[in-house]
């Protein structure tokens, strides 16, 4: 990133974060929500004002707290990204599937990326959680497996 960022570039970046078709959440080290983009609002039904300052675990009881804390601890300690694929862990948050093409799935399959966000001191102070909707890929993989099984029968 350049040393100086023009103010219009900041506006572009904010627009991108809001409009991009992935979930973006920024959490502090106590798992309190600091940033919540429109993808998250649309799929959770919760607006930024409703979630800001609340812990992710209080908002979504279905989150495997021990699992997520282990992943975040690794991100903080190593200062590197961590990933979770839908094949290993189908979802972080149980969102309904709203895709008409893949409507046969009850919930959204998700890939998750955890990014360390360092403060001015260089220490990781926040975590960015990026959620990708993988429902179409999951559905296609299941359909392919079913077709292959049927062809062997």
PLM region spans:
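Hydrophobic helical signal-relay modules used by sensory signaling proteins
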Residues: 12-16, 104, 143-153
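Sensory coupling linkers of modular signal transduction proteins
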Residues: 116-152
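Per-ARNT-Sim (PAS) sensory domains and their PAS-associated C-terminal
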Residues: 66, 77-125
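PAS-family sensory/regulatory domains
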Residues: 50-69
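Sensory modules in modular signal-transduction proteins
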Residues: 4-43
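Short, charged amphipathic alpha-helical "coupling" segments at sensory-output junctions
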Residues: 1-12, 137-146
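Amphipathic alpha-helical regulatory segments at dimerization interfaces
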Residues: 62, 71-78, 153
């Amino acid at each position: 990133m350049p040393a100086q960022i023009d103010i219009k570039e900041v506006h572009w970046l904010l627009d991108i974060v809001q409009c991009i078709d992935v979930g973006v959440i920024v959490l502090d080290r106590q798992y309190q929500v600091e940033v919540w983009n429109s993808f998250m609002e649309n799929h959770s039904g919760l607006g930024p004002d409703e979630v800001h300052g609340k812990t992710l675990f209080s908002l979504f009881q279905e989150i495997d707290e021990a699992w997520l804390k282990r992943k975040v601890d690794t991100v903080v300690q190593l200062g590197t990204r961590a990933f979770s694929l839908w094949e290993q862990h189908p979802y972080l948050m149980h969102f309904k599937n709203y895709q008409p093409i893949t409507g046969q799935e009850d919930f959204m399959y998700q890939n998750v990326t955890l990014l360390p966000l360092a403060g001015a001191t260089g220490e990781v102070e926040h975590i960015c959680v990026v959620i990708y909707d993988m429902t179409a890929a999951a559905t296609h993989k299941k359909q392919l497996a079913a077709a292959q099984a049927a062809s062997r029968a």
